């Protein structure tokens, strides 16, 4: 039997940009696809996700990307608003049907822990790396999408695995109390993103409340 080719499930506008990325030698060799949309479209298929995030471990010149995006805009008839925020070049695209799409190209100087998939010659961040990034993110910001993503990722990895991943990847220690406090922020959420698999807000809140208690009690026992 032949090897099953990895699949990616994107909206038509996301697929259009992904197809342009894979045609560019510069982009497909310099960047990898990551973030919530990579997580949902390649691995978990658990929720709708809007943005396309492409990261590079090396610093890069944004001018070639700006020029490419301008070419794509002419070819596919979308308007572009572009700005730079720290180390990320952000493109806000508006298509003729008024649908909008945000595409980011960012410098992310952290070596990936595992090799991810390759789809149509585009590198995809690994499931473990995305999970480690999510754990590192939730104690810095309070976005329900990150907590939903981590909810499903914690069905596949233990929090201890991810804590060790954060230590290796970011050279930082996340202690159990910090993570427990981050988990409890889920109590403030009022709604969920559009889900593709069953999950309700009460389940999400109870999940993190229970995890926070277990994590705290495990530290006390030690």
Where are the language model's segments positioned?
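Compositionally biased terminal segments of proteins
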Residues: 1-222
